[in-house]
């Protein structure tokens, strides 16, 4: 079973769309499972709705979404008072536009009949545990929204009932482990950060510092996940009479740093990141 694992990265998710234009649209590579965290969950949810053989349609949908996206389609200020809303509101921005965008592109019947598996990861602030949505979990729209609810900027999502879920990147930069547990024998991973994170243009604002910190954390978490996966392969390879097989892991990441602000969904920057993804693929 082959899986595609998509990392978080906010507006840098356009890079994944560009890469998949080549991988799905020109190489016609197919996947049995799509797993994502944060913006990767949004892309995974879109892709999982298409049957084998319809990969070109899937990448056309992603291409249209990311080529025409705008910040207004993702979030807006909660109040006219900007940062003062943090005092009385659960987040700086409202993601009502993002929920509408997710809902407009989601067809539960298509997903149910696609034959594809899905994994989306968020973190429950109440229990500090991971929440995983599969293709069979109710309310996948809320699951996708929860997975990309960047702390402080976006409001946590009360789904499932009794929980309060935020960006899955807090615990998992990529759901590599979820793909392996689901039975994947080959995993393609598309990251939104290059191997060496570039220098930062210092900005003394919380919404600039926060994404920078999360990006550094995510890079470290993925490297740890990859080391664990390689250790798993070594153990399986040396185990006698084991029914488990080593997992082939292919990692793609930007050849150089992408345009930096993960909350900037402007169309021109999105298209630049898409072009970078296509070229790197």
Describe these PLM feature segments:
Residues 51-52, 205-208, 268:
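Short, hinge-like loop/turn segments at secondary-structure boundaries
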Residues 75-190, 196, 240-281:
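Active-site-adjacent alpha/beta core region of enzyme catalytic domains
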Residues 186-242:
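Helix-centered, glycine/charged polyanion-binding patches within enzymatic domains
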Residues 57, 61, 97, 101, ...:
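Exposed alpha-helical structural elements
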Residues 2-5, 10-102, 134-146, 191, ...:
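Patatin-like phospholipase
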Residues 27-28, 52, 184, 204, ...:
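Residue-level recognition of short, well-ordered coil/turn positions
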Residues 20-21, 137-138, 181, 204-207:
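Short, solvent-exposed amphipathic alpha-helical segments in soluble enzyme
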């Amino acid at each position: 079973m082959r899986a595609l694992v998509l990392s978080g990265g906010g507006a840098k998710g356009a890079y994944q769309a560009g890469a998949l234009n080549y991988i799905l649209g020109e190489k016609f590579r197919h996947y049995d499972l799509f797993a994502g965290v944060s913006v990767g969950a949004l892309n995974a949810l879109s892709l999982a709705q298409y049957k084998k053989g319809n990969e070109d349609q899937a990448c056309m949908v992603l291409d249209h979404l990311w080529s025409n996206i705008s910040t207004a389609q993702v979030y807006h200020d909660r109040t006219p008072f900007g940062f003062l809303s943090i005092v009385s509101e659960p987040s700086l921005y409202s993601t009502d536009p993002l929920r509408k965008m997710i809902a407009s592109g989601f067809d539960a019947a298509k997903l149910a009949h696609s034959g594809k598996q899905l994994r989306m990861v968020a973190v429950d602030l109440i229990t500090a545990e991971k929440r995983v949505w599969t293709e069979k979990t109710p309310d996948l729209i809320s699951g996708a929204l929860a997975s990309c609810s960047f702390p402080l900027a976006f409001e946590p999502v009360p789904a499932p009932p009794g929980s309060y879920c935020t960006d899955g990147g807090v615990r998992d930069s990529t759901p590599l482990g979820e793909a392996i547990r689901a039975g994947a024998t080959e995993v393609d991973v598309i990251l939104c950060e290059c191997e060496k994170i570039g220098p930062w243009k210092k900005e003394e604002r919380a919404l600039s510092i926060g994404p920078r910190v999360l990006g550094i954390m995510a890079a470290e978490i993925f490297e740890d996940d990859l080391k664990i996966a390689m250790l798993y392969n070594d153990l399986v390879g040396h185990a006698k009479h084991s029914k488990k097989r080593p997992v082939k892991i292919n990692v793609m990441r930007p050849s150089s740093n992408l345009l930096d602000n993960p909350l900037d969904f402007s169309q021109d920057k999105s298209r630049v990141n898409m072009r970078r993804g296509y070229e790197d693929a």
